[in-house]
Amino acid sequence: MTVLIHVLGSDIPHHNRTVLRFFNDALAATSEHAREFMVVGKDDGLSDSCPALSVQFFPGKKSLAEAVIAKAKANRQQRFFFHGQFNPTLWLALLSGGIKPSQFYWHIWGADLYELSSGLRYKLFYPLRRLAQKRVGCVFATRGDLSFFAKTHPKVRGELLYFPTRMDASLNTMANDRQREGKMTILVGNSGDRSNEHIAALRAVHQQFGDTVKVVVPMGYPPHNEAYIEEVRQAGLELFSEENLQVLSEKLEFDAYLTLLRQCDLGYFIFARQQGIGTLCLLIQAGIPCVLNRENPFWQDMTEQHLPVLFTTDDLNEDIVREAQRQLASVDKNTIAFFSPNYLQGWQRALAIAAGEVA
């Protein structure tokens, strides 16, 4: 049997590194279909830190796409697992027959599914991408994204799968000891990416709570974002006093980020699609409820796991937030499907499906 090849077709360092380390640490030892990778980006020590994997790096999307298409044409038994699919050339190859449906397995990350960009280039490309998506052999995604995808592509097979968020299961009970009182601290957004709509989110928080809460905005990732960070900071200072606004421009190491999250009382995410599951998981683990846009279908996954969900359209106040905290504290976090290590079973099944080992 031909070994499955995994494709990280865009240079998204943080997510690509997370996926590679997860496969190296949790999957490669038990499955030959978890070892071969084609990745856009620089090695930057990844080969050394992931010795169980065979990783081929490419300087750009185009060179990787050409290599994938060549492999697909040379051997029609070769199957590919695409982790987030932001590479236009690969969609066009699937649409034109360069890659066959039986070769194309796609784990939806979020931004690769939704059509939120308004630029002319995107508007021209989205219809072609939609046509190509009808030809995918199988999609893997959150419950909410599967539901969203099925509305337009009901005949494509869908399987539940969660991004392998880096988590320490021993911290699942850490929130139970925390006493929450006094001025609330609200986390706004999961990164410095514009998709977080930081300014609109800050205005929404101010409309709900006024200048009575402390707002923390993590913007250390992606890099080279200084102009936008300053734009957000200035907009925030028009709404909140300086002592109540903390805009973080430096990238935090994982432990420092965890410490930051534990100091919060609420996460506020205004984006109208699924994104930031890693941050949501870490907040929920710490007993911190989240406010979501109703257009973000991840609320379906949360309610399926009996987790409280607040919406941006709700009338929020401190009593409602504290009640959500109490509800979250009563949940056995060791049973949550999208937490580590529970998502591991889904990955083992996904590998078997993509490799053709199970129907």
From Swiss-Prot:
GO terms for molecular function: 4-acetamido-4,6-dideoxy-D-galactose transferase activity; fucosyltransferase activity. It is found in: Cell inner membrane. Keywords: Cell inner membrane, Cell membrane, Glycosyltransferase, Membrane, Transferase. Pathway: Bacterial outer membrane biogenesis; enterobacterial common antigen biosynthesis. The keyword Cell division does not apply. Belongs to the glycosyltransferase 56 family. HAMAP family: WecF_RffT. Catalyzes the synthesis of Und-PP-GlcNAc-ManNAcA-Fuc4NAc (Lipid III), the third lipid-linked intermediate involved in ECA synthesis. This is TDP-N-acetylfucosamine:lipid II N-acetylfucosaminyltransferase. It comes from Escherichia coli O157:H7 (strain EC4115 / EHEC). The gene is wecF.
